[in-house]
Amino acid sequence: VGTQQGRLFRISGLSDVYTQEDADSKLTVDLILTTGAGGITGIAVDANDNSRLAISCGGYGSADRVRFTENALAATPVFNNVHGDLVEMPIYSIEINLNDPNMVVIGTEFGIWATSDITATSVTWSDENDDNSYIPIYAMKQQHLPRSEASNSGVVYVGSFGRGFWESTDELFVGTPEFANTPSTEKFISDFKVFPNPIQT
């Protein structure tokens, strides 16, 4: 869990918690990082190896907004500053690529950026903005389910400031088509029910 004060906590034992009493006795909370670089805005865990973790931080004026560790499960993980050649800008969201764990994609004040090797001595970031221009990217999530469980396995979804939601397709971010304002010409289903219905109690 990341905080606005730049602290990162690791919570262990959640799989054994079923009641408040369990939480009091079975949870372990460890402070594993204090960034000093602004609030933690994003946390990405490698879907293939949960000892690999990357975080993003907000705020201007500092070149330490992206951190990475390969020993997140250790008692005292070592986080490296992987801000690299990025401009000193806020980083709002972050993902470790499911299919290439050395690739990290970030959402920034100025759009989408990526590195092909987060473990490099000097990390180089590339501009991935293409059609969605240099707009703040506040949310980013990759579908981690395998193709046998999800047809969109590996697709990255991003939420922008003012330009809507986008999805990745062959490394190019394209907009998801919007619904037209015209009524559907398909047959109306009058007895269609959705459960549970949050409107009815």
Please describe what each predicted stretch is:
Residues 7-10, 64-68, 111-114, 155, ...:
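A short loop-to-beta-strand structural motif that recurs across blades of beta-propeller domains
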